[in-house]
């Protein structure tokens, strides 16, 4: 059963859209809280959510501020309303609290994709007591050019205002990825090797929009917090952490950077950290050709850990 609702953000009162898929039969195994990536929306995760629901998992996802239905106007897509990373994390926290209130007896598995993978790590840095397992999907490796991106975003914001859409930062961030797959003749080819998925993404008004400087500053702050492992509270060191990514994902940079990302969570204090790369897959492994194997592997891992 699909359930849709919304809540007012504790950060600024913005209406945040939420969707849940509830299995038809009890008992439920656990709750999976999903956190989506940049320039997309929660409905893109319905196939994965349906798969998990059939296995007995309650699955909950919300639209980030400035995404999907969590906007005041359609023109606000890619604008975070000045709340920055902190407001995004507060929204994740609110959903997390609501889940625990509705299902106090169930374990909670937190999973984030791409930008969402940065957000979930920034979240557990302070709130890992609220999470029983963490799944990090399509994680961007730490980008040493981030300070330059921050400087550009701040300068553009000061000159043009927070709603200015930064084509410069967009090109700096994703231009290399587009070039890597230029033979596919799609600027979004780095997202997925399935041409139908790439085409649908390009044609959707809710996908692929250019971030404002306001949103880029939030993104950069999420990356900073996700990789600042020295400041993780790590009150739940036995929490299992699974990293899954496509080996051809340009956000990964390379295998060495992926391994470094996995090690970073171990340095943060977590004892049970595993990483898996999928050959031939790009950024959106949940939408890739062969995604059924990814779904299966994630489900097997959750069950192996007792969820």
Where do the PLM segments sit?
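Alpha/beta-hydrolase-fold enzymes
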Residues: 120-206
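Alpha/beta-hydrolase active-site loop
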Residues: 80-100
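Catalytic active-site module of serine/aspartate enzymes centered on a nucleophile-bearing elbow/loop
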Residues: 268, 272-307
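Active-site glycine-rich loops that stabilize anionic/oxyanionic intermediates
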Residues: 29-32, 36-40, 114, 247-248
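Conserved alpha/beta-hydrolase
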Residues: 44-75
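N-terminal cap/lid segment of alpha/beta-hydrolase-fold proteins
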Residues: 1-24
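Alpha/beta-hydrolase fold nucleophile elbow
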Residues: 103-114
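Short beta-strand/loop motif that positions the catalytic acidic residue
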Residues: 243-245
């Amino acid at each position: 059963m699909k359930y849709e609702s919304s809540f007012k953000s504790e950060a600024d009162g913005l209406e945040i859209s939420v969707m849940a898929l509830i299995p038809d039969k009890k008992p439920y195994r656990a709750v999976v809280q999903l956190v989506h990536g940049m320039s997309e929306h929660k409905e893109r995760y319905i196939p994965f959510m349906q798969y998990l629901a059939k296995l007995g998992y309650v699955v909950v996802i919300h639209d980030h501020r400035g995404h999907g239905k969590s906007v005041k106007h359609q023109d606000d897509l890619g604008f975070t309303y000045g709340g920055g990373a902190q407001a995004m994390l507060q929204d994740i926290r609110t959903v997390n609290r609501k889940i625990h209130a509705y299902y106090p007896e169930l374990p909670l598995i937190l999973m984030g994709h791409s930008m969402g993978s940065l957000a979930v790590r920034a979240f557990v840095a302070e709130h890992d007591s609220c999470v029983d397992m963490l799944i990090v999907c399509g994680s961007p490796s730490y980008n040493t050019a981030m300070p330059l991106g921050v400087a550009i975003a701040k300068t553009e914001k000061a000159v043009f205002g927070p709603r200015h859409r930064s084509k410069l930062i967009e090109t700096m961030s994703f231009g290399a990825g587009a070039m890597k797959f230029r033979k596919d003749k799609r600027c979004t080819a780095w997202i997925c090797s399935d041409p139908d998925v790439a085409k649908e993404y390009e044609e959707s008004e809710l996908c692929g929009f250019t971030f404002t400087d306001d949103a880029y500053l939030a993104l950069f702050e999420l990356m900073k917090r996700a990789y600042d492992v020295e400041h993780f509270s790590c009150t739940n060191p036995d929490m299992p952490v699974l990293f899954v990514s496509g080996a051809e994902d340009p956000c990964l940079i390379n295998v060495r950077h992926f391994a470094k990302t996995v090690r970073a969570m171990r340095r943060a204090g977590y004892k049970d950290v595993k990483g898996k790369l999928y050959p031939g897959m790009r950024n959106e492994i949940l939408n890739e050709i062969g995604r059924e194997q990814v779904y299966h592997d994630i489900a097997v891992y959750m069950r192996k850990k007792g969820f």
